[in-house]
Amino acid sequence: MIRIVLAAFAALSLATPAWAQEKAAVLYKAEGCGCCDGHADHLRANGYKVRVVELADLEPIKKKHGVPAAQAGCHTIEVGGYVVEGHVPAKIIDRLLAEKPPIRGISLPGMPEGSPGMGGAKVEPFTVEELGSGKVFAVD
C-alpha cells in the first residue's frame, strides 16, 4: 500500500499543471529594444516565465501569426496558444488564457504611454483588440 501511495505521489510531482504551462511565454523583440524588456519584466512580476528572443527582423514572426500592420506592436508574444502584440497588461493576458476565446490573439496597437514597459503615466484607457478583427477585447 505504501508503495502505491509513494508511486502516486511521485507521478503527481512530475505532472505540470495546465496553468503553469499557460504562463510560459516567448517574447520576440527587435535587437536593443528596451521597452520590450520592460514588458517582459512586467509579465515576470505577474507570474509569467518569459523567454526573450532578439531578432534582427520581426516581420517573419508577425507574418507567421497573421498580424495586420495596423495592429503590430514592437514585440510579439506567444503564450498559451495565442499571440499577443504590444504592451498588453498581464491581467488582460490572464483573462485571455482563462476564457480561451476562439480568436488568434490580442493587440494593444501603438505604444501607449503608461502601458507596461513604456513608462510614463497612463493618460487614457488602453483598448485591447482581437487580432485581425479589431473588435474590442478589453478596455483597461
What are these regions (language model features)?
Residues V5-A15:
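Bacterial N-terminal signal peptides
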Residues Q21-N46:
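Local sequence-structure signature of Cys/Sec-based thiol-disulfide redox active-site neighborhoods
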Residues A24-A25, G47-V50, G80-V83:
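Short active-site oxyanion
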Residues K64-D140:
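Thiol/selenol-based redox catalytic cores and closely related redox-interacting motifs
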